[in-house]
């Protein structure tokens, strides 16, 4: 947001204003000419945004300034940098920038910002290159500034928003560019206008004949000829004339484009794009993919909202963005009521579909031809119909239809009660809950809500008679229990109803509640019978002769499945149901994903049979799933095509309250196109046993969910045939020639839905006992593409033609079977429910003797056969067998010969291991490895680094490697795309260059070991390439790393475009959804963490340490969603890089830094794993407030990132254990994998320690402790679950009195999930009431009933509109309904409506919804209401308050376009004119004054927009504000001052403000006795001082003198306040002093101001403010002014005595870091002047600084400024070197030579160079071996450091011992001689001096001659510098 002209920071407190910051200076007092991006990085990492930079000091003579990538929003007031040549501001968030005064500017970089207009560049006469690419430039004003640039050659306008008509483009852009005669390079690339017009490039070439390059492509002669030809033929003029007659209509600029098209063309439905959520993704898969778009009036939208424009995302995010409710099952006492449905949309939707079946199809837009063809074969009657795409409302409606459906025989029993109008009629006919029809319930609740009378018509926004949470609870109970609670009736009686009426209602309701409770208790023992839900709309016209009972779908967790298969007869296959979306009841947003039932392509209609439950017997309590019966089918002998579907409509009156979590399915005919693949865990069909013994209790500690796989014809109810499922073989892939595996799921589908566990008693008997037959429908076989179908058909024909193949040996036959594994077509495999295994049997699972040994024997035999085959085959290689033993094939069934022993019945159950995640595409990996082997065997041998050796099969020749583009950086190499043998691969190029024989041998050994590691969660190593560069070859993966998924939001935003552009291709649409839309959900976190732990467990089991485990090394496959770990192994390379570069990574364990990578083990990887886990939850960088160079020290000091409270307990404790400083205390990855393999619900439960203390409920005179209350049934707690917390009832039903809830109860209630659940229900009811009333108002005159309904809905919203409830109101269409009601403008509800909108608009998301719904349109009418009545004035006042809230910068143009700005300006003009004429009524005057106050306050925000400023100035608003500034009312003057502050920088009114004498008026306000006026005037002066012209005017008007007087008065007030102990006065004076000092600091940037300030005795006042006990806030504002005055000589002489005070303040150990740094800066400035050295020496400042260096060893800022002070002292006067030595600073300097921070290292070198001039310090440095340390830095390229080094060496040369060290170090001598070649005189002088000293001794001559010093000296002997010439000749004579 641009804050131009405003001191107020957005979303900050009122007293929060801009903080001025300065760049650090290497040496204080020296001129700075260049600031690179790395130089300014520390200041941006330290301070919080926004950062405001002051570069106006004289020391900043910048020629280059690079502020890229710092999120800056405004760069202005750079005019004083008149020597600046290069200004680089790329990759920021700039909206405002100013280059005025930059007369030397040559290059201006502004790419990738948010600039939408060009500012004045008239001062930049030398500007050559401008980069404005990647901004938001349109065809607006500002391009004429280019015409003033006489030197412009390069202009880049690519990737902007230029999309205007060709005439405007020519007039506003090309015409100014024509005036720039030097323009040669121009780019309009990636602008919409470029592709909008024909021959656009030729048009620009014709308009700009001097242009050489357009879009960075050379303009050829042919293009110029063609452009001239088109111009001569009149082509361009014709285009311009056509455009001038027919203007271009930009549909993208019309926010209501969809609605407009829908209104203009009734036959076309307006298409709205759903927001990409898991719901949209799931709905696209339903019905074979479906269309990617929805309609504006679709089946999923609420049928009650008619006549309102449909918004694309009205409800699409309401379920997804809502925070998960962690306490969905926290109240066991409400289980009976919570199990009932609370949705009110189902019946109306059902009636709507049944009464007008054709309307549904008309409201759905036509789909693509692909979808039509998919349904053509099986649905001849609905060829033109398309399956609808489900929005979140559709999903909710499907849930209601699935739960409340009725059979056809029960449909006749429905009675509609549409004429019920009063509550008394409903109460007279009230029935128990189970007997109410849906329509009766909805009508009753509607009237019940309408009759809840408010307590007060003027109900406040955030207050109510009843607490809002209690009110919501009562309202929720009224809806759930079909009765009005007594408390709510009592409150209603207080407002409108009489006591007699209330008593009658209570007397009638009480028996009804009794009947309801009895009905509820009886329903707990007899579960409701599921009914068949209605078919989808497109299938309602079909009919099926035989209705099918429903089939229940239970999604079982993959890791908990145990499959025990049964022999299946392939001739008998059951019928499969079609897709029915259903919701899984769970307390997270992932639970709202739609689950579906896949279809098989079977076309038979067999008779049905149902399974029977087993006879009751003693059972053990075992956790089981609540399921429905499964239908079995017997196929008929003939095959027919199902063409009809049973018509089902209506619902049973007894089945209204069907449980939400029961999933049912319909059985319409099957579509011809198969659905996308789904995980096996999503398609298990479970049989339902008797549910009579089902009891709802909290779940036990461990859940055992065990489905069973299918039965065939041989299975009977008394004797089921089962076979054991052996443990998957490790080395042999499972293959079956007769069966097929269950198709896997597409990525992104939910693999572990949450299921409601119940206790079911299972007989503790052996498995020999007879079991009932369990048959489940098979899963559909995915239909392959056409090419694959043809290939499979050909293979099947070949197999039929050759049924028997003759093999020469058993080995050939086995290998033939292996080769045919991937192509053999298989049939679907049925799965049935597995019998429950008692817990005690599981303990003996290791003792079971199963046929698994036989499988292992067969496997080993097959291994021997394969080895024998390879031994006899000369052309095969060991890698060729890797495909057959890859673990990815383990999930396939074992080959038939091996499968025979398994089919025998077993005596004991065999536990199946946890299923692994989906494997990576290993076929591509094997292809790479196979090609490497084959090609290397073909080549045989080659030259590798000059050695003729035999080439192993895993080494790729360098001529077979093609290196592509670079992907990124790794821990020890760079990754590139490429090809190996023309196969896409990933190539990692090693960053090391040490290609010794030892290194190559170690590397090849590592490759041979690493390539043997094969795991599903590892990126394998296929081979390597040894050439001049070393490459590691990996298979190519289409994957994203975890760093990108967590921190780059653009990865998630691409899904919208993919859905819009790929509606005609279902497969592409699904792939794009999966590739570009990754939700960081709990499911995702669990999958990633478990995948990493499994991979690391495998690596550690092979003694491989990763040592670089971080986000970038974790890949997520875009196709399969599999988790892959890369960059493992090769630790000898990583250690070498670490030791040389000293990497500082937050993922490295402390022992890696302590031991310098010499001692670490596998436990080091757990540290990086902990950091990854933390970032999965926080989605933020680690140690983001700490400089990267200090991360290592931070970790070594035991500091770790903070773990948020929302991290589950399991993960929180796991993170803390993994990042323990003691590596032996960290858990192994095997333990971690076991922890993460627990049930999903358990590991994501909150910590038991976070449970809330048992609340105390006060009911009348009795106090009840909830811990001893017997009302809750869930007394048994569950470890790790929040279900152990019991919420007591609100009132005591025994006493019948209303309970007063304590604060503890309300706090607990707000933290549970019940509040969210009830809030959703009530808000849906409120939105329905508002929408119904709005729809009736749009069609006819609104009735009184509708107005009353709106009033009651608004009243409920007022009670619920607290900030904590705002999140539940986002995305439900509430603000759109309120906006639509506002357009009606009903006088009865406008004031109440405004109050509600104002309270809700305090939430940013809700305010944006209101604006997007067109909220400024009704707001403009409310603002302009000018009636004299008090009601109208109140409405206008509320509207202006609402405008103040909505006036955000991105929406300010709406204020101008809707006429609000003009209305407010006219109010100002009228107000000021009436006051001058003495007008204004007595009664309305006060109201008008209040309205004007609010209007002026809102104007201070509206005028932040430049266009708004211009219109306000044109309409005469400035003069009105100036008149208000002189108003006697302080409030109005203050607000007018703030509004004028926004206009100060506007060029159109700058002269007007100056001529109006605003500065003298400000001076008058500064003298005002009102403190508030003075403070605001100071802020305005501070803002004005940033403008050079106003700054001069303020100084001329003696503003500084006035400020000094104010400062003195405030200082005296502070002293008076302290003496009298008046804290309030003291605080007021402190605030005034800080504001005055800020203004003075802004004005003192001018040298003239320094003299004026000195003459005003301002320095004397500042000296009074300096003291040891001075307040920190005053000191922070004082020292910036203090530093400015040190550069003024006269002021410095007065300030020098205060050095002792500065040092005294510095000695305070509790001083803030910012104050310490400021004082060090001041002392450094003093030390640069020799006149101040004496005071510094007397102040003992060196001793204090020495203490600071020791105390703040780990503080980067204090350390660097302390070293600068010491360096400055040593530079000016070496007499202080003795003091520096005595204080022990020399050792600190030596220690800092190898500091990790380069700036500290450089400063230490600089300080040492100044100190070596002292003989005593030089001797100490030689003793500490400092000179050889300096030799290590001789290769630096830093010119300043090179100068310091040659300076130090020239003094070290004076000592004989140092000469010996120099003589023995040839690099040192070479460095000295090389300095003779530099053009800087200082280098030549110091080098000549050093050589002259060394040449004095004969022993040094040989070393000097060895580096060629003779030649250099002969050149310098003819130098123009007389001194250098004489010295060179003298040295030559000595050397000769």
Swiss-Prot record:
GO cellular component, one term: cytoplasm
HEAT repeat feature ranges: 325-368, 439-476, 574-614, 617-654, 1317-1356, 1512-1549, 1553-1590, 1598-1635, 1690-1728, 1739-1775, 1780-1817, 1821-1858, 1863-1900
Binding-site residues for ATP, renumbered to this chain: 967-975, 988
SUPFAM superfamilies referenced in this protein's UniProt entry, alphabetically: ARM repeat, Outer arm dynein light chain 1, Protein kinase-like (PK-like)
Amino acid composition bias (Pro residues), ranges on this chain: 527-538, 774-785
Spans annotated as Disordered: 253-319, 347-386, 516-544, 599-620, 660-689, 702-756, 769-809, 1050-1075, 1261-1308
MF-aspect GO terms: ATP binding; protein kinase activity
Cited Pfam families: PK_Tyr_Ser-Thr
InterPro entries, sorted: ARM-like (IPR011989), ARM-type_fold (IPR016024), Armadillo (IPR000225), Kinase-like_dom_sf (IPR011009), Leu-rich_rpt (IPR001611), LRR_dom_sf (IPR032675), Prot_kinase_dom (IPR000719), Protein_kinase_ATP_BS (IPR017441)
Record's keyword annotation contains Cell membrane: no
Annotated LRRCT domain residues: 191-230
Residues of the Protein kinase domain: 961-1241
SMART domains found in the cross-reference section: ARM, LRR_SD22
Record key words, sorted: ATP-binding, Leucine-rich repeat, Nucleotide-binding, Repeat
Spans of repeat LRR: 61-82, 83-103, 104-125, 126-147, 151-173
PROSITE patterns on file: LRR, PROTEIN_KINASE_ATP, PROTEIN_KINASE_DOM
Gene Ontology biological process terms, A to Z: signal transduction
Compositional bias (Low complexity): 253-285, 293-302, 353-373, 516-526, 600-612, 736-756, 786-805, 1052-1075, 1266-1282, 1291-1302
Domain of life: Eukaryota
Gene3D superfamilies: Leucine-rich Repeat Variant, Phosphorylase Kinase, domain 1, Ribonuclease Inhibitor, Transferase(Phosphotransferase) domain 1
Polar residues: compositionally biased ranges: 310-319, 660-673
Domain comment quoted from the record: The protein kinase domain is predicted to be catalytically inactive.
Protein name: Probable inactive serine/threonine-protein kinase DDB_G0278909
């Amino acid at each position: 947001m641009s804050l131009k002209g405003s001191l107020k920071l957005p979303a900050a407190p009122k007293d929060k204003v801009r903080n001025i910051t300065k760049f650090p200076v290497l040496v204080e007092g020296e001129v700075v000419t260049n600031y690179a991006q790395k130089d300014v990085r520390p200041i941006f990492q330290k301070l919080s945004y926004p950062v405001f930079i002051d570069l106006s000091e004289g020391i900043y003579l910048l020629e280059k300034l690079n502020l890229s990538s710092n999120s800056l929003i405004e760069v202005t007031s750079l005019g004083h940098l008149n020597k600046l040549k290069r200004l680089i501001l790329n990759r920021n968030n700039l909206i405002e920038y100013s280059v005025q005064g930059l007369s030397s500017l040559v290059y201006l970089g502004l790419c990738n910002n948010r600039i939408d207009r060009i500012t004045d560049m008239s001062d930049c006469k030398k500007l050559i290159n401008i980069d404005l690419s990647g901004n938001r430039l349109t065809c607006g004003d500002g391009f004429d500034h280019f015409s003033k640039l006489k030197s412009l050659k390069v202009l880049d306008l690519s990737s902007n928003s230029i999309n205007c008509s060709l005439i405007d483009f020519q007039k506003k852009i090309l015409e100014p560019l024509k005036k720039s005669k030097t323009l040669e390079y121009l780019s309009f690339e990636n602008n919409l206008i470029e592709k909008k017009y024909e021959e656009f490039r030729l048009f620009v070439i014709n308009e700009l004949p001097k242009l050489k390059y357009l879009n960075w492509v050379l303009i050829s002669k042919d293009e110029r000829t063609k452009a001239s030809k088109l111009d001569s033929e009149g082509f361009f003029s014709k285009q311009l004339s056509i455009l001038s007659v027919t203007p271009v209509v930009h549909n993208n600029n019309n926010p209501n484009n969809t609605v407009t098209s829908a209104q203009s063309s009734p036959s076309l439905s307006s298409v709205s794009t759903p927001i990409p959520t898991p719901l949209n993704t799931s709905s696209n898969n339903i019905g074979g993919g479906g269309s990617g778009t929805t309609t504006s009036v679709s089946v999923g939208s609420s049928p009650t909202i008619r006549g309102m424009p449909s918004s694309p995302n009205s409800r699409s995010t309401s379920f997804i963005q809502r925070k998960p409710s962690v306490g969905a099952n926290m109240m066991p006492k409400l289980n009976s009521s919570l199990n009932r449905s609370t949705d009110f949309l189902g019946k109306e939707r059902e009636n709507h579909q049944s009464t007008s079946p054709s309307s549904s199809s008309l409201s759905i837009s036509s789909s693509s031809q692909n979808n039509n063809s998919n349904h053509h074969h099986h649905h001849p009657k609905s060829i033109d119909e398309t399956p609808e795409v489900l929005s979140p409302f559709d999903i909710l409606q499907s849930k209601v239809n699935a739960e409340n459906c009725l059979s056809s025989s029960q449909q006749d029993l429905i009675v509609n009660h549409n004429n019920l109008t009063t509550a008394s009629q409903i109460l007279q006919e009230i029935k128990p809950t189970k007997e109410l029809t849906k329509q009766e319930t909805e009508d009753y609740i509607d009237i019940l809500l309408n009759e809840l009378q408010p307590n007060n018509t003027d109900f406040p926004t955030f207050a109510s008679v009843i607490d809002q949470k209690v009110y919501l609870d009562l309202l929720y109970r009224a809806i759930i229990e079909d009765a009005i609670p007594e408390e709510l009736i009592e409150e209603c009686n207080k407002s409108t109803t009489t006591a007699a009426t209330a008593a009658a209602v209570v007397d009638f309701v009480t028996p009804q509640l009794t009947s309801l409770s009895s009905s509820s208790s009886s329903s707990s023992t007899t579960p409701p019978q599921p009914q068949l839900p209605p078919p989808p709309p497109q299938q309602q016209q079909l009919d099926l002769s035989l209705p099918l009972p429903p089939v229940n779908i239970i999604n079982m967790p993959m890791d908990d499945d145990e499959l025990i298969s049964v022999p299946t007869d392939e001739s008998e296959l059951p019928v499969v149901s079609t897709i029915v979306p259903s919701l899984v009841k769970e307390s997270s947003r992932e639970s709202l994903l739609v689950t579906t039932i896949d279809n098989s392509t079977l076309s038979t209609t067999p008779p049905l049979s149902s399974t029977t439950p087993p006879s009751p017997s003693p059972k053990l309590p075992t956790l089981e799933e609540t399921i429905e019966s499964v239908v079995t089918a017997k196929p008929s002998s003939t095959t027919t095509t199902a063409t009809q579907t049973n018509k089902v409509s209506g619902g049973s009156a007894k089945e209204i309250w069907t449980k939400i979590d029961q999933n049912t399915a319909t059985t319409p005919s099957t579509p011809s196109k198969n659905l996308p693949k789904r995980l096996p865990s999503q398609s298990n069909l479970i049989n339902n046993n008797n549910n009579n013994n089902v009891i709802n209790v909290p779940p036990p500690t461990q859940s055992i969910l065990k489905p069973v796989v299918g039965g065939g014809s041989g299975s009977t109810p008394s004797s089921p045939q089962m076979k054991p499922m052996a443990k998957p073989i490790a080395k042999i892939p499972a293959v079956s020639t007769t069966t097929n595996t269950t198709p896997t799921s597409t990525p992104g589908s939910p693999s572990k839905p949450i299921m409601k566990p119940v206790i079911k008693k299972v007989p503790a008997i052996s498995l020999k006992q007879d079991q009932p037959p369990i048959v489940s429908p098979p899963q559909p076989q995915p239909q392959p593409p056409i090419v694959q179908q043809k290939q499979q058909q050909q293979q099947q024909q070949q197999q039929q033609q050759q049924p028997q193949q003759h093999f020469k040996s058993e080995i050939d036959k086995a290998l033939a079977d292996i080769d045919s594994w991937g192509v053999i077509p298989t049939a679907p495999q049925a799965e049935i429910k597995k019998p429950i295994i008692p817990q005690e049997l599981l303990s003996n699972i290791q003792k079971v003797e199963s046929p698994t040994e036989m499988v292992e024997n067969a496997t080993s035999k097959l291994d021997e056969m394969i080895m024998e085959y390879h031994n006899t085959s000369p052309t095969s290689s060991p890698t060729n067998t890797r495909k057959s033993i890859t673990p990815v094939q383990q999930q396939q069934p074992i080959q038939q010969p091996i499968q025979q022993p398994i089919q025998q019945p077993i005596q004991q159950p065999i536990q199946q291991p946890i299923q692994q995640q989906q494997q990576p595409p290993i076929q591509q990996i094997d292809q790479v490895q196979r090609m490497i082997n084959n090609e290397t065997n073909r080549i045989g041998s080659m030259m590798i680094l000059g050695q003729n050796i035999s080439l192993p099969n895993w080494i790729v020749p360098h001529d077979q490697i093609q290196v592509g583009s670079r992907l990124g950086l790794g821990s020890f190499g760079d990754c590139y795309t490429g090809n190996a043998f023309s196969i896409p691969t990933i190539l990692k190029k090693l960053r090391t260059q040490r290609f010794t024989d030892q290194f190559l041998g170690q590397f090849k050994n590592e490759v041979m070991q690493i390539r043997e590691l094969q795991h599903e969660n590892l990126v394998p190593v296929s081979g390597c390439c040894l050439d001049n560069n070393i490459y590691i070859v990996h298979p190519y993966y289409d994957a994203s790393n975890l760093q990108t998924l967590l921190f780059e939001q653009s990865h998630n935003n691409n899904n919208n475009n993919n859905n819009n552009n790929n509606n005609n291709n279902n497969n592409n649409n699904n792939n794009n959804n999966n590739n570009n839309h990754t939700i960081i959900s709990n499911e995702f976190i669990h999958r990633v963490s478990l995948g990493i732990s499994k991979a690391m467990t495998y690596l550690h089991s092979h003694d491989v340490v990763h040592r670089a485990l971080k986000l970038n090394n974790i890949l997520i496959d875009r196709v399969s969603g599999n988790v892959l770990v890369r960059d493992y192994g090769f630790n000898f390379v990583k250690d070498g890089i670490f030791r040389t570069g000293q990497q500082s990574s937050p993922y490295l364990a402390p022992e890696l830094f302590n031991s310098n990578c010499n001692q670490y083990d596998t436990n080091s990887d757990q540290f990086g794993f902990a950091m990854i886990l933390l970032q999965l939850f926080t989605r933020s960088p680690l140690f983001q407030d700490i400089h990267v160079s200090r991360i290592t020290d931070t970790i070594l000091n035991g500091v770790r990132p903070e773990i948020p409270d929302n991290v589950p307990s399991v993960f929180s404790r796991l993170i803390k254990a993994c990042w323990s400083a003691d590596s032996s205390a960290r858990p192994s990855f095997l333990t971690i994998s076991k922890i993460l393999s627990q049930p999903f619900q358990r590991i994501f439960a909150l910590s038991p320690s976070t449970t809330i203390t048992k609340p105390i409920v006060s009911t009348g005179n009795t106090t009840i402790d909830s811990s001893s209350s017997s009302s809750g049934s869930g007394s048994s707690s569950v470890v790790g679950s929040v279900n152990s917390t019991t919420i007591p009832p609100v009132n005591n039903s025994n006493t019948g009195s209303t309970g007063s809830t304590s604060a503890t109860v309300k706090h607990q209630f707000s933290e549970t999930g019940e509040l969210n659940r009830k809030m959703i229900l009530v808000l849906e009811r409120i939105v329905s009431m508002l929408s119904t009333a709005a729809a009736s108002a749009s069609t006819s005159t609104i009735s009184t009933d509708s107005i009353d309904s709106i009033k009651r809905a608004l009243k409920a919203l007022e009670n619920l509109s607290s900030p904590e409830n705002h999140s539940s109101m986002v995305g439900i269409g509430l603000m759109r309904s309120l906006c639509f009601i506002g357009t009606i403008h009903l006088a009865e509800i406008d004031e109440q409506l405004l109050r509600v909108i104002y309270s809700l608009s305090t939430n940013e998301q809700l305010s944006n919804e209101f604006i997007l719904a067109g909220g400024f349109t009704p707001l403009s009418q409310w603002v302009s209401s000018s009636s004299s009545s008090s009601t109208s004035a109140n409405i206008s006042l509320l509207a202006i308050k609402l405008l103040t809230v909505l006036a955000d910068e991105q929406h300010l143009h709406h204020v101008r376009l809707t006429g609000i700005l003009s209305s407010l300006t006219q109010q100002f003009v009228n107000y000021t004119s009436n006051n001058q004429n003495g007008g204004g009524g007595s009664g309305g005057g006060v109201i008008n004054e209040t309205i004007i106050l609010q209007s002026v306050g809102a104007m201070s925000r509206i005028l932040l927009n430049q266009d708004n400023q211009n219109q306000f100035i044109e309409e005469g608003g400035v003069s009105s504000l100036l008149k208000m500034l002189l108003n006697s009312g302080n409030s109005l003057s203050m607000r007018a001052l703030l509004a004028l502050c926004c206009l100060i920088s506007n060029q159109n009114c700058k002269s007007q403000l100056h001529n109006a004498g605003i500065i003298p008026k400000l001076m008058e306000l500064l003298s005002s006795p009102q403190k508030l006026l003075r403070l605001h005037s100071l802020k305005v002066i501070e803002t004005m001082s940033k403008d050079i012209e106003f700054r001069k005017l303020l100084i001329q008007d003696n503003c500084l003198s006035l400020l000094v007087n104010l400062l003195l008065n405030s200082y005296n007030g502070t002293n008076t306040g302290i003496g009298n102990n008046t804290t309030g006065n003291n605080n007021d004076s402190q605030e005034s002093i800080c504001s005055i000092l800020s203004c003075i600091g802004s004005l003192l940037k001018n040298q003239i101001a320094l003299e004026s300030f000195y003459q005003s005795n301002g320095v004397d006042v500042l000296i009074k403010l300096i003291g040891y006990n001075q307040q920190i806030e005053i000191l922070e504002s004082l020292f910036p002014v203090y530093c400015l005055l040190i550069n003024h000589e006269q002021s410095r002489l007065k300030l020098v005595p205060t050095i002792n005070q500065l040092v005294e303040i510095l000695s305070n150990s509790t001083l803030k870091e910012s104050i310490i740094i400021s004082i060090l800066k001041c002392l450094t400035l003093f030390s640069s002047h020799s006149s101040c050295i004496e005071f510094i020496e007397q102040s003992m400042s060196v001793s204090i600084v020495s203490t600071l260096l020791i105390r703040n060893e780990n503080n980067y800022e204090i350390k660097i400024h302390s070293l600068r002070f010491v360096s400055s002292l040593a530079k000016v006067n070496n007499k202080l070197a003795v003091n520096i030595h005595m204080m022990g600073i020399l050792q600190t300097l030596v220690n800092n030579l190898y500091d990790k921070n380069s700036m500290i290292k450089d400063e230490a070198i600089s300080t040492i160079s100044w100190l070596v001039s002292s003989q005593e310090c030089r001797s100490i440095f030689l003793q500490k071996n400092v000179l050889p340390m300096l030799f290590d830095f001789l290769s630096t390229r830093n010119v300043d450091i090179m100068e310091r080094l040659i300076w130090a060496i020239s003094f070290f040369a004076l000592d004989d011992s140092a000469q010996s060290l120099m003589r023995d170090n040839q690099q040192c001598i070479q460095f000295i001689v090389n300095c003779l070649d530099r053009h800087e005189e200082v280098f030549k002088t110091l080098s000549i001096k050093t050589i002259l000293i060394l040449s004095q001794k004969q022993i040094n001559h040989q070393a000097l001659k060895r580096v060629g010093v003779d030649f250099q000296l002969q050149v310098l002997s003819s130098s123009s510098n007389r001194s250098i010439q004489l010295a060179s000749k003298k040295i030559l004579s000595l050397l000769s």
